[in-house]
UniProtKB/Swiss-Prot annotation:
EC supergroup of this enzyme: transferase
Localization terms from the record: Cytoplasm
GO molecular function terms attached to this record: 3'-5' exonuclease activity; DNA-directed DNA polymerase activity
GO biological process: DNA replication
Protein name stated in the entry: DNA polymerase III subunit alpha
Organism: Mycoplasma pneumoniae (strain ATCC 29342 / M129 / Subtype 1) (Mycoplasmoides pneumoniae)
PANTHER family: DNA POLYMERASE III SUBUNIT ALPHA
Assembly with partners or alone: DNA polymerase III contains a core (composed of alpha, epsilon and theta chains) that associates with a tau subunit. This core dimerizes to form the PolIII' complex. PolIII' associates with the gamma complex (composed of gamma, delta, delta', psi and chi chains) and with the beta chain to form the complete DNA polymerase III complex.
Length: 872
C-alpha cells in the first residue's frame, strides 16, 4: 500500500493545477486506499473531504508550514490523525505565518514530517543532522535517513525524513515519498516545454513506490494511514441559538408588533393575520430557526436606531409576516398574497437566507456591530476567490512566455460571446481567428488549462457568518481587514457545516435615497419615517415612469426597461413588479402577449374557471413562481409546502423528475374533480413557464425601492439628479445625460465661477455650477484651496480679478501655482468678473510683470464653457 503524503491543490495559489477533485481522481485511478492534501492553507479541505467521501477513499489532511531552526527555514508537513488533530491544524492555520512559530501547542493528534526544499541541498546542510536537531524540540521522535530521487524532474536529490511521535506510531521507520506536484503555474515560468508537463501528473503510483521503498517502510506508512481518522461530518456546527428560550422571545416580539400594526390598521382582518403568524411561527420553531430571525431583527434594529437606511426587502423573505413584523422587510405579505412556504418549508432542506440591503456608506458600521455584539470568535466574513478568466489567463500566460503581443492578438480576435474553453482550433471557421490560434497555439492551450482556477483569495462583498460557539472549532479561519476573521471555507460549503450566513449588501441607491431625503425632509422626521409617508399611488411618478424618465431610478435605467415601461404603462406597485419580472431572458418573449392581453383583453375560454383568478392578475400570462404554487394547490389539492416542492421540481427540467411529479399532479387533480384533459392542459402550461417564473416577493421588494427612487426624482428632481452627478465621477456619458435633463428642466449650466461654485456640482437659483474638481488638472487639494479663497471673497465681494488671482497664489490662502490659474481661466472660473475692464487690467498687469498668464481671448464677452476642460 502507498499514499502520496505531500500533494498540493490549486488552492496553493499559482503552485499547482490540481483541483481537490482531480487529486482524488488520481488516487482512485491508481486504486490507492487513501489520499492526502497538504496545502499551506485549508481552503480546499472541505471540497477534498467531500470528494473523498463520494469516491469511498480515505482522506488525510495536512498543512504545510515553515519554521526557523538554526537560522534556516525548514518546511514541515503537519498531518492530522484525529478530529482533535484537525482542530489543532485549524488553529495552526490561523497563526502559521507569524514569526517564531512554535508548533508544540498544535501537535496533539498530529504527525510532523520534514519536507526538504531547495534551501536544504545536500551540499549546504545535512538534513539528517537537522532532523535530529528538530527532534530535540519534539521529544520521542524517530528519524529515517534514506534519500529518494524525485522522478520526472531535473532537480537535486530530495530527502524525505519522517518524524513521528512514538506514542501514536510504533518506532519502526517508514519513508513515504514527498512529491510536490509539478503541474504548477509557478513551474510554467521555469520549465518551458510546459504543455507536456501540464498534461503529466507527477503523482507517484503504487507500482513505482514499491520499487523505491522497502516493505517495512510501506508497512509503517500503512500504520499511519490506518491510525488517521479525520471526519468532517463530526465537526458540523450546532444550530444557532442566541437564547435558551429563543422561540418564546420571537413569538413575544411578533405578537407585540402585530398588535401595534393592527391598531394602526383597524380595517384589516385580524383573524387572518393572527392565523398567518401562528402558522409561520410553528414552521420556524419546528425547524429551530427562531435565533436566526432574532439575529437579523437585531441587526435591522441597530441600523434603524443609528440612522442607517435598510432596503424594503429582497428575495423570498419578503413573503414572511414574521420578517415584516420585525421590520426586516416592508411589504405586507398578507395584503399582497405572498407565500411564506416559498421562503421556508419543512419539505426543503437548508437554512433560511435573508439578504439585507444596507446603504453602502454605512455597511461597515453594521459589520462592526456584529463583531462587537456576538464576539470576534463567533463571527467571520467569508472568503471568495478571484479566478482566472479568459483575458487574465491569456495575459498572464503571455507574460510567462514573454509573448504579450500574442495574447493581445488573440484577445482582439476572440468573439465577445466565446471563452477559450469553447474554442476548438479545428472547429473555428473564421480564417483570421484560426490563423491566430494556430500561431499562438501553445499560449492558447496553456491559458485554457488555468481558466476558472483560483488566483488568489479575497473577501466576499456581503457575507458574514455568525455562530454561538467559537467558529475555529468548526472551520478554518484567517485574519482579514480590521483584524476580523475570514473563513477559509467559501460560500458554497457553509451550509454543509450548518453555518448560518447573513448577506449584508451595500447598495449605493440606498445611500442616495438617504442623503437626498436627509436634504429635503423636516428635521423632526427620520429618513425611514419620511419614506413610509410616501404615497404609493402618486400619479406624477407613474407618468414619469411611463415617459421613461428613469435616469438614476433603481433597476429601471436600461433601454430595454424603458421600452417595457412605455408599453406596460404601470400605475401601481404590482405593475412595477411585473415590469421587473418580465424584462429577463426567457420571460421577455411574453412581454408582447402580456401587453396585448392587458390592452385588448384575453380569451378566458380555455382557462379553467378555478384557476382563472390566479392568472387574471397577470392577464393570462404565468409570470410569478407564486402563481405556479397556487395553481398546483388549487388543482392537485397540494399543501403550500408540497406545491412549492412541485414548482422547484418542474423548473429543473429533469425529465424523470417531471414525469414523477406529473403522475402525482394528475392523481391529485383527478381526486379534486379535474378532468384528465384539464389536468394535462394545466400541467403542460405550468411546465412551459415554470422555469422562467420570477419570485413575486422579491419583485415587490425591489419594485418598492424602484418606486421610492422614481418618486424622489419626480418631486425632488434637483437634489436627486445633483446627487447622481456628484457620485458618477468618471462616467461621463451618464453625467452628460444628467446635465441634459437639467437643461430640459430649465436650468442654466454655468462654469465653476470662483465666487459661486463648489468642489463638486452645485445648484443655486436654477443655475447648475460645474465643480472645481471637474476641471482637468485640478485635484482635491486645489479644489479645497479654491473654497478657502471663496470664503475670503464672500467677506470682500468687491475684490478685483488681480486681487483674486493673488489670493489664489498666496501661500497663506490658496497656495495655487501659475499653471493652475491658467486651467481655472480656461474653465471659466473668472467669468464672474467684468470681462472688458478687469481682464484688460489683469492682462496689462501680468504683461508688465513679464507673465503671459491668460491666453488670447475676446475681451467683449467671457468664454463659453470649454467642455474639454472637464473631460467631456
Amino acid at each position: 500500500m502507498f499514499v502520496n503524503l505531500h500533494t498540493n491543490s490549486y488552492y496553493n495559489f499559482l503552485n499547482s493545477t490540481l483541483s481537490p477533485q482531480k487529486l482524488v481522481d488520481l488516487a482512485v485511478q491508481d486504486q490507492q486506499v487513501a489520499v492526502c492534501l497538504t496545502d499551506p492553507n485549508l481552503f480546499g479541505a472541505t471540497e477534498f473531504f467531500l470528494a473523498c467521501q463520494k469516491a469511498h477513499i480515505k482522506p488525510l489532511i495536512g498543512l504545510s508550514v515553515t519554521v526557523r531552526h538554526y537560522e534556516q527555514n525548514v518546511n514541515l508537513l503537519v498531518i492530522a490523525q484525529t478530529n482533535r488533530g484537525y482542530q489543532n491544524l485549524m488553529c495552526l492555520a490561523l497563526v502559521k505565518d507569524q514569526p517564531d512559530l512554535q508548533l508544540e501547542p498544535f501537535l496533539d493528534g498530529n504527525v510532523v514530517i520534514i519536507c526538504t526544499q531547495t534551501e536544504l541541498r545536500l551540499n549546504t546542510a545535512n538534513p539528517v543532522y537537522l532532523a535530529h536537531g528538530l527532534s530535540g524540540r519534539y521529544p520521542k521522535i524517530a528519524v529515517t535517513q534514506k534519500p529518494v530521487k524525485c522522478q520526472n524532474t531535473n532537480k537535486d536529490l530530495t530527502l524525505l525524513l519522517t518524524l513521528k511521535q512514538i506514542s501514536q506510531i510504533n518506532s519502526e521507520h517508514f519513508q513515504p515519498l514527498e512529491w510536490k506536484l509539478s503541474r504548477s503555474l509557478n513551474e510554467i515560468q521555469l520549465d518551458p516545454p510546459l504543455l507536456q508537463q501540464l498534461r503529466h501528473q507527477p503523482f507517484l503510483s503504487q507500482k513505482a513506490a514499491q520499487q523505491i521503498f522497502s516493505e517495512e517502510e510501506l508497512g509503517n506508512l500503512q500504520k499511519l494511514v490506518e491510525q488517521s481518522q479525520w471526519d468532517l461530518t463530526k465537526l458540523k456546527a450546532s444550530s444557532l441559538q442566541v437564547s435558551h428560550n429563543d422561540a418564546q422571545m420571537l413569538s413575544e416580539q411578533c405578537q407585540l408588533a402585530l398588535t401595534e400594526f393592527l391598531k394602526l390598521n383597524p380595517q384589516l382582518n385580524k383573524q387572518l393575520y393572527e392565523e398567518r403568524l401562528a402558522k409561520e411561527l410553528e414552521i420556524i420553531n419546528s425547524l429551530h430557526f427562531a435565533s436566526y430571525f432574532l439575529v437579523v431583527s437585531d441587526l435591522v434594529q441597530f441600523a434603524h436606531n443609528n440612522d442607517i437606511l435598510i432596503g424594503p426587502g429582497r428575495g423570498s423573505a419578503v413573503g414572511s409576516l414574521v420578517a415584516f413584523l420585525l421590520k426586516i422587510t416592508q411589504i405586507d405579505p398578507v395584503a399582497n398574497n405572498l407565500i411564506f412556504e416559498r421562503f421556508i418549508s419543512r419539505h426543503r432542506q437548508g437554512l433560511p437566507d435573508i439578504d439585507i440591503d444596507i446603504m453602502e456608506t454605512k455597511r461597515d458600521l453594521v459589520i462592526d456591530y456584529v463583531m462587537q455584539k456576538y464576539g470576534r470568535e463567533q463571527c467571520a466574513q467569508i472568503v471568495t476567490f478571484q479566478k482566472f478568466k479568459t483575458r487574465s489567463a491569456l495575459r498572464d500566460v503571455g507574460k510567462v512566455f514573454n509573448h504579450i503581443e500574442g495574447a493581445e492578438d488573440l484577445l482582439g480576435k476572440l468573439p465577445k460571446d466565446k471563452s477559450l474553453l469553447e474554442l476548438d482550433v479545428n472547429g473555428v471557421t473564421d480564417p483570421v481567428l484560426q490563423l491566430s490560434l494556430k500561431s499562438f497555439r501553445l499560449l492558447w492551450e496553456v491559458a485554457r488549462e488555468i481558466i476558472n482556477f483560483p488566483r488568489q483569495p479575497s473577501i466576499h462583498a456581503s457575507g458574514v457568518v455568525i455562530v454561538t460557539e467559537p467558529l475555529i472549532t468548526t472551520i478554518p479561519l484567517m485574519v482579514g481587514n480590521n483584524n476580523n476573521y475570514v473563513t477559509q471555507v467559501s460560500m458554497d460549503w457553509l451550509e454543509w457545516y450548518n453555518l448560518n450566513k447573513f448577506d449584508l449588501l451595500g447598495l449605493i441607491n440606498l445611500t442616495m435615497i438617504h442623503e437626498v431625503v436627509q436634504a429635503v425632509k423636516p428635521k423632526e422626521v427620520s429618513v425611514q419615517q419620511f419614506l413610509q409617508q410616501i404615497p404609493l399611488d402618486d400619479e406624477a411618478t407613474f407618468t414619469n415612469l411611463t415617459n421613461q424618465a428613469t435616469l438614476g431610478v433603481f433597476q429601471l435605467e436600461s433601454f430595454g426597461m424603458k421600452k417595457v415601461l412605455k408599453q406596460i404603462k404601470p400605475h401601481n406597485l404590482h405593475d412595477l413588479a411585473i415590469v421587473l419580472a418580465l424584462y429577463r431572458p426567457g420571460p421577455q418573449d411574453n412581454i408582447n402577449t402580456f401587453i396585448a392581453n392587458r390592452n385588448l383583453g384575453f380569451d378566458t375560454s380555455d382557462i379553467d374557471p378555478r384557476i382563472l383568478p390566479i392568472l387574471k392578475e397577470t392577464y393570462g400570462v404565468l409570470i410569478f413562481q407564486e402563481q405556479v404554487i397556487n395553481i398546483a394547490k388549487t388543482v392537485a389539492n397540494y399543501s403550500l409546502e408540497t406545491a412549492d416542492s412541485f414548482r422547484r421540481a418542474i423548473s429543473k427540467k429533469n425529465l424523470q423528475v417531471i414525469q414523477d411529479n406529473m403522475r402525482s399532479f394528475y392523481e391529485g387533480a383527478l381526486a379534486n374533480n379535474f378532468s384528465l384533459k384539464a389536468a394535462t392542459t394545466i400541467f403542460n402550461y405550468i411546465q412551459r413557464f415554470a422555469g422562467y417564473g420570477f419570485n413575486l416577493s422579491h419583485a415587490l421588494g425591489y419594485a418598492l425601492l424602484s418606486y421610492w427612487t422614481a418618486w424622489l426624482k419626480t418631486h425632488y428632481f434637483e437634489q436627486f439628479n445633483l446627487w447622481w452627478l456628484n457620485h458618477e465621477q468618471g462616467k461621463k456619458e451618464k453625467q452628460k445625460q444628467l446635465l441634459n435633463e437639467f437643461i430640459s428642466s430649465g436650468y442654466e449650466i454655468c462654469p465653476p465661477l470662483i465666487n459661486k461654485a463648489k468642489s463638486d456640482f452645485s445648484v443655486q437659483d436654477k443655475k447648475l455650477y460645474l465643480g472645481f474638481k471637474l476641471i482637468n488638472g485640478i485635484g482635491d487639494k486645489q479644489a479645497h484651496a479654491l473654497e478657502h479663497v471663496q470664503e475670503v471673497l464672500k467677506q470682500n465681494p468687491n475684490l478685483s480679478l488681480i486681487a483674486t488671482v493673488n489670493l489664489c497664489l498666496s501661500k497663506t490662502v490658496g497656495g495655487l501655482e501659475l499653471k493652475d490659474i491658467t486651467l481655472l481661466q480656461q474653465a471659466g472660473c473668472f467669468n464672474c468678473f467684468n470681462y472688458t475692464v478687469d481682464f484688460n487690467l489683469a492682462k496689462s498687469f501680468w504683461v508688465q510683470s513679464n507673465h503671459e498668464l491668460f491666453p488670447k481671448i475676446p475681451l467683449d464677452q467671457p468664454p463659453v464653457i470649454n467642455w474639454k476642460s472637464f473631460g467631456f
